[in-house]
């Protein structure tokens, strides 16, 4: 064996294990660090919001302003509930949903969250109803205006009214996630606070006479005529004064005739039927008479010329028109010939109604309830008082005549 070959193979260096020279070590120490890996561009906030919106099904916009935590809304969406599902649920079903949420996820709902969920659903229902009413009134405005003008002969005037803007409802108790949603989502679901309208200086005075009560209620007409559908400049329909007209006569100029007045009562009946249908669909209590709910519905539908003070002011005139149309027409002709104003005609409508009540046992409530068009209206307090007074006078006259007749037949001592 060659010793040189053996020594060469024994002392052969492995290049993989060889250390670099000192100069190389110094270069490695001062070499710049490698560039960081290129990260994907951050996801835009709007895209994240859209993904979050799809995940929650719109619940974040529904609940954000009512103090519901984001985790609560996420768990409700995880259970499969959407905005449309919650809007169609009753209060009992909402309670069951919240109890299931607490039991399944071991998530204790705050007291404010339980009330906030129901409040948010009620507010969304009202918003959808107002949008539907505005849509219907816009569709019916072309066809309904012509018929209304034919009856009223320019009976309505439109006056711009400056209104204050509504305050937006502040966000509450949701954490940073809600803040991100609010910063991006904006105001599709802005909740508006209703401001109470301050009455214009007409004080209420408690008096026994129902006539004075009706006059006091007339001061609220401006409040009910104010349009609540948003801020800025809106249009308010102001009623022209009534004048006495004969049957079939159209009022001239900026006046309204009595046929138009009676037509308003027929419109109230139609609005009552619509309110009843809506209440039946929701499983709520149906009104059987024209109440404040009907007047609010009429105002939202665009019929702001229908208001409680005016309709109550002339309801006994409409009752005479329904119970005895011939007598009502004769009274209208007589007052038109004499040139009397509508106030005198209104006062004169009481006497025929009292005579009708006298022929039917003085029970004016039964008379109203028995008539299909009058059953939906409350009997005016003034009319009931007049019937009671006339009944007492008739009873006193009858008793005095009986006592006088008996005294004439008594023997004289």
UniProtKB/Swiss-Prot annotation:
Subcellular location: Nucleus
Top-level taxon in the UniProt lineage: Eukaryota
Chain intervals with Acidic residues compositional bias: 211-225
DNA-binding positions: 238-242, 307-314, 378-381
Alphabetized UniProt keyword annotations: Activator, Developmental protein, DNA-binding, Nucleus, Transcription, Transcription regulation
GO molecular-function terms, A-Z: DNA binding
General function of this protein: Probable transcription factor that act to specify determinacy in the progenitor cells for both flowers and leaves.
Protein name as it appears in the record: Floricaula/leafy homolog 1
Organism annotation: Nicotiana tabacum
Species classification: Eukaryota, Viridiplantae, Streptophyta, Embryophyta, Tracheophyta
């Amino acid at each position: 064996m060659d010793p040189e070959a053996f020594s060469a193979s024994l002392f052969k260096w492995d290049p993989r294990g060889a250390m670099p020279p000192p100069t190389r070590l110094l270069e490695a120490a001062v070499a710049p660090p490698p560039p960081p890996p290129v990260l994907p561009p951050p996801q835009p906030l709007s895209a994240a919001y859209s993904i979050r919106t799809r995940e929650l099904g719109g619940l974040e916009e529904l609940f954000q302003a009512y103090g519901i935590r984001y985790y609560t809304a996420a768990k409700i969406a995880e259970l499969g509930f959407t905005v449309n599902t919650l809007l169609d649920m009753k209060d009992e079903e909402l309670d069951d949903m919240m109890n299931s949420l607490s039991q399944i996820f071991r998530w204790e709902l705050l007291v404010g969250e339980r009330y906030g969920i129901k409040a948010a659903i009620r507010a969304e229902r009202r918003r959808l109803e107002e949008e539907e009413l505005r849509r219907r009134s816009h569709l019916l405005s072309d066809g309904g205006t012509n018929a209304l003008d034919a009856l009223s002969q320019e009976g309505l005037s439109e006056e711009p009214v400056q209104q204050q803007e509504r305050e937006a409802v502040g966000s509450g108790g949701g954490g940073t996630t809600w803040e991100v949603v609010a910063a991006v989502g904006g105001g599709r679901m802005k909740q508006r606070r209703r401001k109470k309208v301050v009455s214009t200086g007409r004080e209420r005075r408690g008096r026994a006479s129902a006539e004075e009560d009706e006059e006091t209620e007339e001061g609220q007409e401006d409040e009910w005529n104010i349009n609540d559908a948003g801020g800025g400049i809106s249009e308010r329909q102001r009623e022209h004064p009534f004048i006495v007209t004969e049957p079939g006569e159209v009022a001239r100029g900026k006046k309204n005739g009595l046929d138009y007045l009676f037509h308003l009562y027929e419109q109230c009946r139609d609005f009552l039927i619509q309110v009843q249908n809506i209440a039946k669909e929701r499983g709520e209590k149906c009104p059987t008479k024209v109440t404040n709910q009907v007047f609010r519905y009429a105002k939202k539908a665009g019929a702001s010329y229908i208001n409680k003070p005016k309709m109550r002011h002339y309801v006994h005139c409409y009752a005479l028109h329904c119970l005895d149309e011939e007598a009502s027409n004769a009274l209208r002709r007589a007052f038109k010939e004499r040139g009397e104003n509508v106030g005198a005609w209104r006062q004169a409508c009481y006497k025929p109604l009292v005579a009708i009540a006298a022929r039917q046992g003085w029970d004016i409530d039964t008379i109203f309830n028995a008539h299909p068009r009058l059953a939906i209206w409350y009997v005016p307090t003034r009319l009931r008082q007049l019937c009671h007074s006339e009944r007492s006078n008739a009873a006193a006259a009858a008793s005095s005549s009986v006592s006088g007749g008996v005294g004439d037949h008594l023997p004289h001592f």
